[in-house]
Amino acid sequence: MHILMKCLGNKINDFNHKRVNDYIKDKLEIKDVLFRGLTIEEVLSYKFEVNKRIKFKRITSFSSESHIAETFAAERYMTNVLIVLKNANIFDYSTAMIEILENLIAIEESGQTDDDKLNKLYDNLSIVDYEREFLLPISSELTVKNIYFDNKKNMHIIEME
């Protein structure tokens, strides 16, 4: 099984964080703007301040779709805190996983397989494509550039580079 499959759905353990990090660290690209809804643990532990450098302790996911991150911030984590990340060196998880899943689907469709397994692959493909996820490697350092409240979104925004 490909190591990136460990990232589907659930949080991965520390051992797999290192394995995924080893895989992605040499496959980074610059992405203009990405978004992340923050958990309460992240809000409390990182203590965001303008000009402060923050080192992320584990692989951290971002989306290229602001509405995805806003939904996580407001509905799942209930923090209403959003990171807007600019010009980051990051791994394009969605594109890599779409390729892996499409290859698995092709293999399954060419042989005898049960519908449940194939349906699960299609479900995962749909989720990965929808979330447009990117992964920031372990120990990445970013600088807080600005913090403000966006009344229209009802979100605290933390701009980082």
Which stretches of residues belong to each language-model region?
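Mono-ADP-ribosyltransferase
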Residues: 1-161
